[in-house]
Amino acid sequence: MIDREVLLRVTQRCEELRIRLVLDECFIEFLPVPERYSMLRETERYHRLFILRAFTKIYAMPGLRLGYGLSSDDELLEKMQHMRQPWSVSVPAQEAGIAALDEDEYIR
């Protein structure tokens, strides 16, 4: 894992240089203290930061392909919305994702 302070410096530098930084946090929930490494709270502060997360890893449902991205860049999110397929998430994946959100005990 990359130290959070290093990530903050990299994120700041990317912001200064107008470079989009994409961080894959799909496995972060497997860490003992995920909050220590996550940059999720920094998306409001850093406009060019984009974070990837997935249900498929932590909830053990890899065949369903359910993930999401987080960013405070409304322009980017709007462009992504216009480019996506209307059926980008299958009904079984949607149902499994909704059910997974109620499984706090499984995550612990």
Where are these regions (language model features)?
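Active-site pre-lysine segment of PLP-dependent enzymes
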Residues: M1-L21, E25-I58
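PLP-dependent aminotransferase class I/II
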Residues: R48-R108
